[in-house]
């Protein structure tokens, strides 16, 4: 009996050498033993290898261009041409990444597909930013947004271009692999056009200088990103981020570009047989005819334009489109405010005249879809203050006069509603 006890005591894990007494569990196999601690360690190694494998990264099916357009259509009204352009560009971009990550997709000819960043042209409030945000949400990739006017060349007061990459890392919770597949949206890029068509001997640190500084990260480079924001922490360790697979969407209103395009097209259209179109048609469709030479004349440098081969144009939203923006998307503003009031047990009714008047006011202010929320806040703000204290109110009605004349919204009580239904 004592011999059997001694034999049990000498049983050891075949991997770490610990005895049966030193571990919680010792599992026996044909001539081998493994302890619970070694099992846990093996599980951790397998999980880590699986998380880092290319197959894991590309498991998620890439939506087709038609599916991307349909998804955008649920949230963004109009801009059909821009949606199609963006859908194809985004599909090709992430298809290219998947091909690079999966060796079996590489062909024998070793063709390397270049990155195609996107330039979006269109007036304020036409949906440029929202299109980019919706794309990132659909693809479930990190999204960072910055204003080009805040950027300056390195060494000058303002943000370095590396700070854009820091925002992307923050959006990815500092997961470098995830950040390297993200989307960066740079707005107001028309504001960094150089001041003159001809190169200047004076330094343009917030115009042409920023365009020059952006060239490398647009094309694809391994950038050193300061995790604490750069200039105030010179001794920090940098994070290396490869921008080869980061999709850049660069956008701007480009006010005045239509005149540049019109001048070029006007010269081409002189003489007998030339097509004559109205001034309104020219201004409406001008961006559709944009050429690289027009952007150079506007103030973008040729190298910068060359790194933005895909051009998507968006148009001003008219009254009908703005009314649809208010009511149709899945998260439309009217649906959002209806939900807020519904939480207080109140129904929101927007009369057709009110919707048209709100759209007209946004057009008058020149704010487009971006200004719709501010107008609704002006109308509904006082109501949302009163309603929580008014237990008998069941419905709020917004009429055209509430928008055009500042009339107070009609509050319908439960007794009044019963009287009207009777």
From Swiss-Prot:
Zn(2+) binds at residues 13, 16, 35, 38. Coiled coil: none annotated. It comes from the Bacteria. Residues 1-54 form the ClpX-type ZB domain. InterPro entries: AAA+_ATPase, ATP-dep_Clp_protease_ClpX, ATPase_AAA_core, Clp_ATPase_C, Clp_protease_ATP-bd_su_ClpX, ClpX_bact, P-loop_NTPase, Znf_CppX_C4. CDD domains: RecA-like_ClpX. Gene3D superfamilies: 1.10.8.60, ClpX chaperone, C4-type zinc finger domain (6.20.220.10), P-loop containing nucleotide triphosphate hydrolases (3.40.50.300). The keyword Aminoacyl-tRNA synthetase does not apply. ATP binds at residues 123-130. GO terms for cellular component: HslUV protease complex. Belongs to the ClpX chaperone family. Component of the ClpX-ClpP complex. Forms a hexameric ring that, in the presence of ATP, binds to fourteen ClpP subunits assembled into a disk-like structure with a central cavity, resembling the structure of eukaryotic proteasomes. PANTHER family: ATP-DEPENDENT CLP PROTEASE ATP-BINDING SUBUNIT CLPX-LIKE, MITOCHONDRIAL, ATP-DEPENDENT CLP PROTEASE ATP-BINDING SUBUNIT CLPX-LIKE, MITOCHONDRIAL-RELATED. ATP-dependent specificity component of the Clp protease. It directs the protease to specific substrates. Can perform chaperone functions in the absence of ClpP. NCBIfam families: clpX, PRK05342.1. This is ATP-dependent Clp protease ATP-binding subunit ClpX. It comes from Corynebacterium kroppenstedtii (strain DSM 44385 / JCM 11950 / CIP 105744 / CCUG 35717). The lineage of its organism: Bacteria, Bacillati, Actinomycetota, Actinomycetes, Mycobacteriales.
